[in-house]
Amino acid sequence: EQLLLRWDIEGDEAIPSEAIKALFEEAKVHLDKATAVILSDYGQGVIVEEGVKTIIEAASQNNIPVIADPKLTGLHHTHGVDWVIFQANGLELMRRRLCVESGDDAAHLLIKNHDWKHLVVVCGAAGVTIYSADGSSVHAECTLTDLRQMIGLVDAAVVAIAVAISEKLGVSHTAQLVNAACECILAASSSDSFVLNRDDLVDRIGEMAWNLQVSKR
């Protein structure tokens, strides 16, 4: 199944600054109940620089990790966050903009420039790679041979990272969990009716573990 055309109609009017301020103030009130903060920016809505900065600072003061799914033109909104998610084509675009030789070089330079802790790159058939501020990287290979669709890949990765944070998983296990969530999306027969849930994720991890055991890896 392939999505050939999508037409989203949104209002062009800017959201009143009073409303944006109220939303961010309300979000700050509930931070103490949060395991993680997720920022998803598609260039519309309430992701504005001052508000995002306030949330990131408040989360940092409360030791709450921040996960960001940024628009490439809005990376300045993500300075100092813990987890940032790119798709492979996004990293390649940034590699060209930064004029570096490899995606690895681009990833580590982005981490340094924006003070991120981790950059997660989801690559579909090429699996998942997590780059970290200490210069290390971890890769989880995709185990699927039949990839059906990719819609919702980044959303699945965000959910998996949030789960990994709540379970206090290390980077290596987080990469495996993100890869499992992405494989659930890649193997889905229909993007419209599929919803990632706990059972699907557990089943996928079980299949991955079995495949690794069979191949003795």
Residue ranges, per PLM feature:
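Nucleotide phosphate-binding site architecture
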Residues: 92
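Structural motif
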Residues: 6-8, 35-39, 67, 85, ...
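Short, ordered loop/turn segments at secondary-structure junctions
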Residues: 42, 71-73, 89
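Conserved phosphate-binding/catalytic loop of the ribokinase/pfkB sugar-kinase fold
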Residues: 1-31
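Short acidic, glycine-rich surface-loop motifs adjacent to enzyme active sites
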Residues: 30-46
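Non-cysteine beta-strand/loop elements that form the S-adenosyl-L-methionine
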Residues: 81-89
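Conserved phosphate-binding/catalytic region of the ribokinase-like
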Residues: 14, 33, 50-65, 70-80, ...
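Residues at alpha-helix caps and immediate loop-helix transition turns in enzyme cores, especially N-
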Residues: 19, 47-52
